[in-house]
């Protein structure tokens, strides 16, 4: 398994957390939903449609296109989400028409893109003064003893582990990144708490959907090491009926310079 290859993980993605509808409604208002006619949204790196479904609820009258490069992820999205058209494309080459979108977003996926190519592409597809949002649902570890224990065990089992995400550790200055190419300006940072209560099965399934840990575990110690990590997590939660997982939602919203 390679970092960034989600083919084998698509079947587990339904276990992942969503995003708060209240925040997305607010961001969509900033982008002009409700005041503009023919409002169009591009959910880029849409995966199986976790954010796509939220956008459908927040902007039911909008045209939504979900852009996803991975065939397996896109197939799962088509089955699960009916409010959008799923097409093959990437952050660097969406295949969307120029000046066709009012709002573009990447949910927990912008860190996988080459921002020197993706940001100009987003500016190209957005209408004048269009809005781009990069958003993440980062797990909150400081008040979660089980998660802290799991993370510490994983680090001990994979000593060279390097996380590829925009969680709360080792994260980039995304405001600077988003404005670095000159394609976007006035980048605003928004943050809010969020939580979801998961069954043990879903909690474990969410871990099975995490690409960067699984890829590094397999590369470091083979499939057996990844199986050992899953067994360790399962053992940590064996006495729990369900698990309330806390998140910090981190959103970066910027205006196109077009």
For the regions a protein language model found, what residue spans apply to each?
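Conserved class I S-adenosyl-L-methionine
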Residues: 1-34
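A short, conserved alpha-helix within the catalytic core of class I
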Residues: 113-121
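Conserved Class I S-adenosyl-L-methionine
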Residues: 172-258
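Short catalytic micro-motifs in class I SAM-dependent methyltransferases
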Residues: 107-108
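Class I SAM-dependent methyltransferase SAM/SAH-binding core
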Residues: 42-44, 48-93
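Conserved catalytic/acceptor-binding region of the Class I
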Residues: 123, 127-196
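A short acidic, Gly/Pro-enriched loop at the edge of an enzyme's catalytic core
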Residues: 92-103
């Amino acid at each position: 398994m390679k970092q960034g290859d989600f083919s084998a993980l698509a079947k587990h993605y339904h276990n992942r957390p969503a995003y708060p509808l209240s925040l997305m409604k607010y961001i969509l208002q900033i982008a002009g939903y409700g005041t503009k006619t023919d409002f169009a949204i591009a959910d880029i790196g849409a995966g199986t449609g976790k954010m796509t479904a939220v956008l459908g609820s927040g902007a039911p009258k909008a045209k939504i296109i979900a852009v996803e490069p991975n065939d397996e992820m896109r197939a799962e999205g088509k089955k699960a989400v009916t409010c959008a058209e799923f097409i093959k494309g990437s952050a660097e080459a969406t295949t969307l028409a120029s000046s066709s979108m009012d709002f573009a977003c990447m949910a927990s996926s912008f860190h996988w893109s080459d921002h020197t190519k993706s940001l100009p592409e987003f500016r190209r597809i957005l209408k004048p003064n269009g809005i781009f949002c990069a958003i993440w649902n980062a797990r909150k570890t400081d008040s979660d003893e089980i998660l802290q224990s799991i993370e510490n065990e994983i680090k001990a089992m994979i000593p060279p582990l390097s996380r590829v995400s925009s969680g709360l550790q080792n994260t980039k200055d995304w405001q600077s990144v988003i404005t670095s190419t000159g394609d976007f300006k006035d980048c605003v940072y928004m943050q809010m708490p969020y939580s979801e209560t998961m069954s043990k099965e879903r909690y474990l399934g969410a871990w099975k959907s995490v690409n960067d840990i699984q890829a590094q575990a397999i590369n470091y110690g083979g499939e057996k090491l990844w199986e050992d990590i899953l067994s360790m997590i399962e053992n940590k939660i064996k006495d729990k009926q369900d698990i309330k997982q806390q998140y910090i939602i981190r959103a970066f919203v910027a205006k196109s310079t077009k």
